[in-house]
Amino acid sequence: MNKTKLALAAILVVIAATAAALAVGTAPGSAKSGAAFKAAWIYVGPHNDGGWSQAHDQGRLAVQKALGSKVQTTYKENVPEGPQVSQVIESLIRDGNKIIFGTSFGFQPAMAAAAKKHPDVKFEMATGTIIQKNMAEYYGAGEDAIYLSGIAAGAATKSGTVGYVVPFAIPEVIRHTNAFALGVQKSHPGAKVKIIWTNSWFAPDKEKKAAESLHSSGADVLGQNDDSPSAGQFSEANGNPR
């Protein structure tokens, strides 16, 4: 993930996590017992992936640092989108967590179901389309920064072909891909943007192979929307702007 998106994700998690700060001391019995408010994050990849999940974990650590002993944070990593999400959520609730951050789009169905089942727990989705009384969605206009990165990519390409590695064809990713392509065309009219779908949020090997394929097809500048830094690392190793 590029540095702009990494910083944006970290900032957004910190902003969204203020919900935990507001809840400290307001949960039933918390003020009397002095018990720390428990907050949990669920990651689709490893917490130190060098990209999306790591940005969220930096947000978690910032919350822990800001609130100190008032909050106890935890995380579950490498949770695949599917039935396992519900199991992880239920486990976190049994452990006493009162706010849960789901950081992958595919966690949404399980998060929404859990929100209905546990009205006393708060749920925060990083990107999503479902809002409930105790479930919110947080994100920002990432396409603005991605449009600017597209302008930079268009200005840097000499071959007139820019490559872009993307995960899933969901609205958010399509919006970001369009923004990148429009940015390329803004600074380099007539330039082409070639994309490869990895159909995975975090798959370093797939992302590297996609970058190799785009490079072989003539793309001399590469961008990415996946979670790991693999595409960027390949680009850097081969002297391509990224």
What is the role of each PLM region?
Residues 2-9, 23-24, 29-242:
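A residue-level marker of the well-folded mature domains of exported/periplasmic proteins
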Residues 15-25:
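Hydrophobic alpha-helical membrane-insertion segments, chiefly the h-region
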